[in-house]
């Protein structure tokens, strides 16, 4: 086992790059090996104030979410767990963690349960990103986190004996287990997501370069992979009887909860909506950078590598955190695509007048 202590130095670079206030809290993540592929993460609040943050899609989440990235010979090992989109307001307490200054918590998990490590050998593990912080159960900002780089030697026999977190379901038609009002809602969401994606593709290719840079953090002429990903989402959303993904109206794996809108299983290109997708979200929002069914569906489609490869990750949620990412992270951040699709005044589906100059919305999500 080899541990490289990079967290403090990299967090300092992150804080400088984002021009965060000097007293901005950060989370320091220390990864250690427990036994073979079983890993312990110790998360510490290095700031001088108490923070409450969303621990879903992060350490302490009991679901098979992506807590770390695994690399073998410089290539990332495919993640076989779930990626989910969360509420940004009205969050329940069971999705929140509070840490006092200097406070810590630990989380143990087995990386072989969400990644094929049966080849054994040297595997490098690390993680970084932003965790949403909350005020009165509403996301009000973000806190950066960064881990050390942990190098482990994997025993292939032991790795093969670790049960996979998710057992694949039988393949079905593109839209599965849908009927009644949910089928109607999903049909509308797919149609709207397709229209938003196609309009966003045009905005990315020939719209404002300033707006493009605002979201994707690059001054180069709109990388083709942005417009290409939006166009691919538009194609995938255009048919409910064929396509490259399987879309469930309900929760086939049991990973929905009171804070989860929908989730994607990238390794099988499966998407599932949760109950609050229907009960909480409008079909289309009239508010700048707010959540709705259409952009949630668009968000999930970007996770699926069969739609456009590589699939996106969840480096950050919401406008403030997503526009604080580096260019390389923003280009692979699912919420960046959802926010760009919602936040462009070129898009025809809902009232986006509040987003006509999104640069003034830095205080929003």
From Swiss-Prot:
Matching Pfam families: Peptidase_M35
EC class name: hydrolase
Reactions catalysed according to its record: Preferential cleavage of bonds with hydrophobic residues in P1'. Also 3-Asn-|-Gln-4 and 8-Gly-|-Ser-9 bonds in insulin B chain
Domain of life: Eukaryota
Active site: 300
Cofactor annotation comment: Binds 1 zinc ion per subunit.
Name under which the protein is recorded: Neutral protease 2 homolog mep20
């Amino acid at each position: 086992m080899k541990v490289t202590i990079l967290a403090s130095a990299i967090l300092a670079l992150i804080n400088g790059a984002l021009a965060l206030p000097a007293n901005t809290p950060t989370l320091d993540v220390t990864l250690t090996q427990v036994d073979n592929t079983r890993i312990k993460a110790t998360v510490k609040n290095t700031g001088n104030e108490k923070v409450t943050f969303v621990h879903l899609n992060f350490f302490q989440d009991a679901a098979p979410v992506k807590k770390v990235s695994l690399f073998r010979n410089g290539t990332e090992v495919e993640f076989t767990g779930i990626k989910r989109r969360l509420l940004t307001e009205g969050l329940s307490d069971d999705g929140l963690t509070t840490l006092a200054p200097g406070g810590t918590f630990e989380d143990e998990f087995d990386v072989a349960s969400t990644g094929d490590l049966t080849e054994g050998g040297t595997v490098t593990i690390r993680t970084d990103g932003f965790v949403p912080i909350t005020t009165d159960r509403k996301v009000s900002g973000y806190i950066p986190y960064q881990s050390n780089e942990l190098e482990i030697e994997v025993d292939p026999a032991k790795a093969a004996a670790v049960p996979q977190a998710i057992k694949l379901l039988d393949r079905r038609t593109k839209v599965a287990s849908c009927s009644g009002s949910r089928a109607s809602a999903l049909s509308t969401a797919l149609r709207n997501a397709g229209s938003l994606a196609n309009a966003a593709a045009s905005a990315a290719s020939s719209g404002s370069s300033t707006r493009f840079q605002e979201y994707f953090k690059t001054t180069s002429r709109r990388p083709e992979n942005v417009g290409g990903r939006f166009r691919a989402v538009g194609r995938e959303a255009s048919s409910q009887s064929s396509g490259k993904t399987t879309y469930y109206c309900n929760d086939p794996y049991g990973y929905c909860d009171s804070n989860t809108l929908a989730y994607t299983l990238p390794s099988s290109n499966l998407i599932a909506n949760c109950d609050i997708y229907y009960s909480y979200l409008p079909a289309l929002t009239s508010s700048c950078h707010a959540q709705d069914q259409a952009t949630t569906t668009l968000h999930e489609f970007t996770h699926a590598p069969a739609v456009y490869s590589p699939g996106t990750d969840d480096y950050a949620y919401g406008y403030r955190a997503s526009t604080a990412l580096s260019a390389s992270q923003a280009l692979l951040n699912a919420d960046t695509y959802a926010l760009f699709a919602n936040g462009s005044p070129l898009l025809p589906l809902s009232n986006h007048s509040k987003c006509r100059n999104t640069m003034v919305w830095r205080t929003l999500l």
